[in-house]
Amino acid sequence: MITQEHYCALPAPKIRTLKHLRTFEVTLDKHGLGPVAGVDEAGRGSCCGPITIAACIMPQRPIAQLQALTDSKKLSAAKRAELYPLIKKYALAWSIIHISAAEIDREGIQHANIFGMRRAIEKLDVAPGYVLTDAMKVPGLRCPSLPIIGGDAAVRCIAAASVLAKHSRDLIMDDLGGKYPEYGLEDHKGYGTKSHMDAVRHHGATPEHRYSYSNVKAAHDQWLQEKTQ
């Protein structure tokens, strides 16, 4: 039987077709280690809004409607929006967790990310027998897990989780863009672009900003200084 130790030495498979995208999941499942859950996050590098983590268990069969599935960063916003309900429809189980900016400031991004991944896995309606993540180790799980570098482009369940996380978070950032129109959050999704930091320097940070991030703190402090002069 293939064990976790066997897999720790394996690189992510070279992807050419959707069949290759399912290689890790199918092999683990055939050796009695399924069901296999994929986990990924969106918004870790952002300085505003939540970090969003999704977990997903996909059926071990080809799904024609998901032929376009790959790493969410390689898909257009329109394609992610198209795949989002289809993934929910065909997945055996899925979950989405949002960790707020306030919690990120309180606990740190690394802790928030790992905690969110554990929570997303625990929230699945189907208990996984094995968990595959996109490069990040997640301690404290009830089943074996394996981080795969480039997993969001190499493993179907991770790719599915990446789309769920990215699109779900984008919807939140679109809503925050309407709530705080001065910052253009619906465009840059909370990442530290020049226009975003200029807006923080001009208007100050919102409650949705991550004050523990140095770029937010510097821009917000500049706004405070100019405000008090």
UniProtKB/Swiss-Prot annotation:
MF GO annotations: manganese ion binding; RNA binding; RNA-DNA hybrid ribonuclease activity
**What keywords are annotated for this sequence in UniProt?**
Cytoplasm, Endonuclease, Hydrolase, Manganese, Metal-binding, Nuclease
Query: Which PROSITE patterns would you find in this protein's record?
Result: RNASE_H_2
Q: List the GO cellular component terms.
A: cytoplasm; ribonuclease H2 complex
Database matches in InterPro entries = RNase_HII, RNase_HII/HIII, RNase_HII/HIII_dom, RNaseH-like_sf, RNaseH_sf
- RNase H type-2 domain: which residues? 34-225
User: Which subcellular locations apply to this protein?
Assistant: Cytoplasm
Disulfide bond positions? none
One family from Pfam that matches here is RNase_HII
Its recorded reaction(s) are:
Endonucleolytic cleavage to 5'-phosphomonoester
Kindly list the residue ranges recorded as spanning the membrane.
Answer: none
Cofactor names = Mn(2+); Mg(2+)
Q: Which SUPFAM superfamilies match?
A: Ribonuclease H-like
Q: Which HAMAP family match?
A: RNase_HII_B
NCBIfam families referenced in this protein's UniProt entry, alphabetically: PRK00015.1-3, PRK00015.2-2
Q: What does this protein do?
A: Endonuclease that specifically degrades the RNA of RNA-DNA hybrids.
**What protein am I looking at?**
Ribonuclease HII
